[in-house]
A protein has these predicted regions:
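Internal, active-site/partner-interface "lid" segment
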Residues: 245-267
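N-terminal export/assembly segments and adjacent metallocofactor-ligating motifs
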Residues: 1-244, 259
Length: 267
């Protein structure tokens, strides 16, 4: 069918966050997605898309999707369709009841890694403003917490330090324990473009991922380390950099805590 309007949205299949124009028709519960078109002005994808974001949107109108709120007071009860007003009021009253009985910290919120930044922000706002505590988390923390802690300790923020455009200036790309072509396909495409222009790729992974040898690109080096030896491998690299005086001293002085770097180097 022909779309009636386009709605700008963000793909949540992975962390790239590609911008799309969802071309739809109909209104309310009858809204139907006709097609997903990558946004040419999207900062992350610049008009590109992977097969998941472009075509895997059938769940939005799947016949098994629940379109109306339902309530059951015990696990043995049958589900009962209710209005949105009743569902929201019931949820709010139950949350208040639990807090009144077990204390303010008895309730928290956790978001899916499929949520956008804006959706996660709304959840933490609700938990802090309505529940009155800081019991908020996201399942993305399970994989991101080590990098978040390291970035926060080093740079003062747990966010990434580079944008996707920076890969286009990279001369050497080091991929450790990641599989960009499967996990972040649009970014992987930009990386492959740079590799075809002559950048070198080093893959450190027990697996022989697609980037090790793919059509038109292949890794300069593949280190198939044993599972669980990432820290040992990185420590060995750091040891060589320090002992063979390969560190960029000017960069260290400009970007690092000299005293802490000295203690680390001595270690």
């Amino acid at each position: 069918g022909q779309p009636e309007r386009a709605v700008t949205t963000t793909c949540a299949y992975c962390g790239v966050g590609c911008s799309f124009k969802a071309e739809v028709r109909g209104d309310g519960a009858a809204t139907e997605v006709v097609r997903m078109v990558p946004d040419r002005n999207g900062d992350a994808n610049e008009g590109h898309a992977c097969v998941k974001g472009r075509f895997a949107y059938g769940y939005a109108t799947h016949r098994d999707r629940i379109l109306k709120p339902m309530i059951r007071k015990t696990i043995r009860d049958e589900w009962r369709e209710v209005s949105w007003a009743e569902a929201i009021a019931y949820a709010a009253s139950e949350l208040r009841r639990v807090q009144a009985k077990y204390g303010r910290d008895s309730i928290g919120g956790i978001t899916s890694s499929r949520c956008t930044n804006e959706e996660t922000f709304l959840v933490q706002k609700m938990v802090r403003a309505a529940f009155g505590n800081n019991n908020v988390d996201t399942c993305a923390r399970v994989c991101h917490s080590p990098t978040g802690y390291g970035l926060s300790s080093t740079f003062g923020t747990s966010a990434g330090t580079q944008d996707f455009d920076s890969v286009e200036q990279a001369d050497v790309i080091l991929v450790i324990g990641a599989n960009p072509t499967d996990a972040h396909p649009v970014f992987a495409s930009r990386m492959k473009q740079r590799l075809r222009k002559g950048a070198k790729l080093i893959v450190i992974d027990p697996r022989r991922i697609d980037l090790v040898r793919a059509p038109h690109v292949q890794a300069t080096h593949h280190l198939p380390i044993l599972p669980g030896t990432n820290v040992a491998m990185l420590t060995a690299l750091a040891h060589v950099i320090v002992t063979e005086k390969l560190a960029d001293d000017a960069f260290v002085r400009a970007r690092c805590d000299i005293e802490s770097f000295g203690e680390w180097a001595d270690f």
